[in-house]
Structure formats: C-alpha cells, structure tokens
C-alpha cells in the first residue's frame, strides 16, 4: 500500500510534506479522543484539512514551502501533544500513537486497514496516468487534458488515508519512513515506474512482516522495528550485488 504512494513522494521530493501530514495525525487523535469520535476517520479528515491549508498558504503567504511545511508539521504536533496533556480524564497510550503498537489493533482496525488499503490502491490505479504525467511535466499533462490538479488533490487525499489507516501500526512519527524507504530501495532495481511501484510494495510488505515478527519476538515497538527492517533492505540494496554475482561466477571452477 505504501509502496506506490512512496514512489510519487520520492519522484516529487515530497518527504517533508509527508512528515507534515503524519505529524498532524496526532492532532487528529487528540480531537477524536476529546469529541469521542472514531480515531481513524478523524485523523483522515485532519490530514486532508492540513493538506488543503498548506496549498492555500503556499499561494498567499510570503514564506517558502519549506518554512510552511516546518511550521505546520511542528505546530500540529505540538498542539496535539498539549491537548492530550490536558485530557487527564482519558488514558492515552502516547508511545503507541507515536511509534505504533500492534497489540492495540483490534478486529475493526484490521477490517478498516484491508478495506482502506484496497480502496487506496484502486483509486491510485485510476489516477496513475494523470498523476504520473503531472509528476513528469505539469504543462504537458494540462495540454493533454489529463487534469493534473484533480490528480494532485486525490493524491493528497490518498496520502491522508494511508496515514490514517497505518498510524496504529507504524506510529505518526515513522509513517513517512515506511513510505520513502521501500520506494528508495526499489528505485535501484526497477527499470520502469510501474515496476518500481510493484517492487516498492513487495519491499514494504516484507518490511512490515519482518518488523512485526521482530517486534513480537524481542518485545520492541512495532513502528521502529518495521522501519529498521526496511532500512536493512535499503542497506542491502546499496551493496554491489551485480559485482558479487560476477565475482562468484568468475571464481566458480570450470567444468571439463
């Protein structure tokens, strides 16, 4: 699920944008607990609002994009923490929200993750052509009538959805890492954008499985364990694999 979206984050250099949306998730958690709303739905709505607010400020404010991203990222995180601190009547597992807690996931969460994940993948498949065209060249996408602005809007909505449904597994502070690292790893092996998205999905799924297995075995936080697994995959991808294969074939004794 995170793989294809992560590819667009890497291609568009939107890592800090992903951080901003993921940090705003904690504000969504605080509002959900305060108003007794569904956490996943509230986080999704708050993430979309923050994304729209960012677009509005970029058009009207005097600050640069980096400054706006930093302002919104840390402001929403700080406000969320302050609101949670005042809610003394609610028992909040702050570490679970920040770094993920596999034990906090119930059957309803699993259903939401599956349905939400399939919906995100289906929506991404529908806007893939226009979104990729807008990534390569915005003007050409407009000239060809691919409606890149609409694709960009839905991309932000899909980002918010991924953050909302994966927050309990990875945690709000590490969601962006799960989006970026598998995509960065897949980039070294893929020969086409579609192949990169598929490989990134496979690497992301493997990282989640290995990370959760390690978390259960060694009693480590789920989110950091998943990110460490993804990081190990990226480090392995940096090794001169082709050179090693050639070396092994060269050292193999000749037959006959």
Residue ranges and their predicted role:
Residues 220-256:
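Cytosolic-side transmembrane-helix boundaries in multi-pass membrane proteins
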Residues 40-45, 70-71, 110-115, 150-157, ...:
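Hydrophobic alpha-helical transmembrane segments
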Residues 24-34, 72-84, 104, 148-160, ...:
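Small-residue-rich segments of transmembrane alpha-helices in multi-pass membrane proteins
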Residues 122-155:
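Membrane-helix/interface signature in polytopic inner-membrane proteins
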Residues 61, 69-129, 157:
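Transmembrane helix-bundle core of multi-pass membrane transporters
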Residues 37-49, 114-118, 164-178, 224:
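Structural signature of hydrophobic alpha-helical transmembrane segments
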Residues 169, 175-224:
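Transmembrane alpha-helical segments in multi-pass inner-membrane proteins
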Residues 7-90, 186-198, 215-218, 241-243:
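Short loop segments and helix-boundary regions at transmembrane helix junctions
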């Amino acid at each position: 699920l995170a793989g294809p979206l992560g590819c667009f984050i890497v291609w568009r250099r939107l890592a800090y944008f992903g951080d901003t949306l993921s940090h705003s998730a904690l504000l969504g958690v605080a509002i959900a607990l305060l108003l007794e709303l569904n956490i996943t739905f509230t986080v999704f709505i708050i993430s979309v609002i923050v994304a729209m607010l960012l677009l509005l400020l970029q058009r009207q404010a005097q600050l640069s994009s980096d400054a706006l991203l930093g302002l919104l990222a840390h402001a929403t995180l700080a406000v969320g923490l302050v609101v949670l601190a005042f809610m003394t009547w609610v028992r909040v597992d702050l570490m679970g929200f920040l770094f993920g807690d596999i034990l906090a996931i119930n059957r309803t969460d699993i259903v939401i993750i599956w349905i939400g994940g399939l919906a995100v993948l289906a929506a991404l498949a529908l806007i893939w052509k226009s979104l990729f065209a807008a990534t390569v060249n915005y003007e050409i996408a407009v000239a060809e009538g691919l409606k890149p602005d609409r694709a960009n809007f839905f991309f932000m909505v899909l980002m918010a959805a991924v953050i909302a449904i994966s927050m309990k597994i990875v945690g709000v502070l590490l969601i962006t890492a799960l989006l970026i690292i598998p995509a960065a790893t897949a980039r070294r092996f893929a020969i086409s954008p579609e192949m990169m998205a598929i490989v990134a999905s496979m690497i992301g799924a493997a990282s989640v499985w290995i990370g959760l297995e390690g978390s259960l075995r060694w009693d480590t936080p789920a989110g950091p364990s998943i990110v460490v697994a993804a990081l190990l995959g990226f480090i392995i991808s940096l090794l001169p694999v082709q050179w090693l294969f050639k070396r092994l074939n060269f050292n193999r004794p000749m037959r006959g």
